[in-house]
Curated annotation (Swiss-Prot):
GO BP: any one term: translation
GO MF term set: structural constituent of ribosome
Pfam families the record matches: Ribosomal_L30 (PF00327)
Stated name of the protein: Large ribosomal subunit protein uL30
Entry similarity comment: Belongs to the universal ribosomal protein uL30 family.
HAMAP family: Ribosomal_uL30_B
Amino acid sequence: MAKVKITLVKSLIGRKKDQIATVNALGLKKIGNIVQHEETPQISGMIKKVSYLLKVEEA
């Protein structure tokens, strides 16, 4: 499977609790944090849910 590099680019202030929980489940806490994950259906769904807060690149 391919790896993806995910960066949090927008703040979580004022977001719904489920969106904050999704970002935290991806391992992101602060703006500018970067994590790498395998591109599984679960991770893809989480990225889709909060895509407007993230920057996603191939790793």
